[in-house]
């Protein structure tokens, strides 16, 4: 496959995709994958080891929300000392600790200390955004001649799934590990008409951390009606460490065949 390479310094750019589901004989399925490669020294930490000497997945409470919902964190670990924490609220990446080129471990994502802070800040910090990442202008769209009006939460526009998007939902979780990777899988059902979107949408997001120091995020969804969807991961990264200051000297290379231009409304 040929790719167009886009290289830029991090400022205000965003790469988006726009997907429409159409039902034929069966439920339509969309899948895509985001892979993050953490490049650094191959350092095996004494505290982790390899094989059966350490637990690849740890689960613990992360406190409760103001409405009483209990939140849990799943820590995925590998043999290189990398650890990523995912919580069932919003399928959020809470932290990503990895070894840099100098052998130092840093948390390279931004996050909060309490789960309620993620809802109060409304910054979509580390969350899976859905049903639709970015704005839909005036909260309106049409499919097959049918007009739909969404819940508006950004002036007249619908932003990141609406008033109660996927980032504010509790996801069902399951875990799996083998001798080279650890996975937490999260599932969510969005009912027909939720936030104004047509179709019942069943979404799965899985995070897999491998001993090759890759964090792989797989997305899949099925719908029973023509709809729009644009799932994304809204983590804020600073490869120097979350408390290291500006990221404006970072450079990003995106291998993409195409991109969707965006403006302040969509």
Where are these regions (language model features)?
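Bacterial N-terminal signal peptides that target proteins for export
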Residues: 13-18, 22-35
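Bacterial N-terminal signal peptides
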Residues: 36-46
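An exposed, glycine/acidic-rich loop-and-rim segment of catalytic or binding clefts
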Residues: 49-82, 88-266
